[in-house]
Amino acid sequence: MLEKTMNRRTMIKGAMAAGAVAGAAGMALPSVRPAAAQDNLQIAFSVPGLNFPFFVHMMNLAEQHAAELGGIDFIPLDGQQNGAPSSTKQTADLEAMIAQGIDGLVISPNDVAALAPAIQSVIDAGIPVVTVDRNVTDVNTLAHVGADNVEGGRLQGRYLIEILPDGGDVYELQGQPGATPAIDRHAGLDEVIAAQDAVKIVVSQTAEFARDKAVTVFESALAGNPEPAAVVCANDDMAFGVAEVAQAQGLSIPIIGFDALPEALIAINDGSMAATVEQFPGGQSTQAIDILVDYLLNDVTPAEHDTYLTPILITKDNLSAAERAVEAGVGGDATPAA
């Protein structure tokens, strides 16, 4: 596999060198991207599940960016099986990509521990890998691009303290166990809440980033505990589930999400959600593609292995700062901050 990838890269570089000679002779320079379809770079992009709007957006922006660059056969890989993210399915997809002989892989692993061996197998086959959103620390990947999810959790915690000046009991809905964003967002939130005494997390349970599970978890929590002063969720999908229950039961409580999905921006605008955290998933996926392509074509290894975009808190006061604000119909001028 390494030989196949290197042959393709050598051929592309040969075309570039020939172009330089042609340019010196006054001839038109060819694109640095291979023109013929059979010379295209084959890049696979794997996500835990396209049943999550977050990953749909990430995939769409990556595919759009690959098309803009040109010379790339973009291969989308959906890791869900039977309607849910599956490490087994994602592993099988990677095995198929090794057999197919792709040139590079961008992946957001469903479970970082479960996918680590499969990702290492891809690397051992001579295929460079860039992780996006979810980092795998024990595997020798080319690079990782993500958001600072610990800081995102801190933003949620600081906002809770701001809107609850007299304190209060808060429910927390955590994300999928084993997913680094879920782990990091909880850590950031816990760090801020633990540093003061007024706001307390009295219920902290996983709803696995899923709206339907959030409905069940929140209903169960309400049945056994006093009404919370606020609810903080590790993603917007869970916040939507909480909002659904709150509306059905006539509760008026601040609900804080994470991801800045268009539906969340609309909900913040109409008052059914209080805030969300923007982590610029489109910025993450396009930067991951850029790093991989630059390595494949130019042998450029990033100076830093990890690239983290700085998340921002989105409330009704700054809706236009969200990456998908225009899509949501609330304006937009966001620029990802590294």
Where are each of the predicted segments found?
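N-terminal secretory signal peptides
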Residues: M1-T10, G14-V32
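Short, solvent-exposed amphipathic alpha-helices that sit
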Residues: F54-E68, G152-Y159, T180-V199, K213, ...
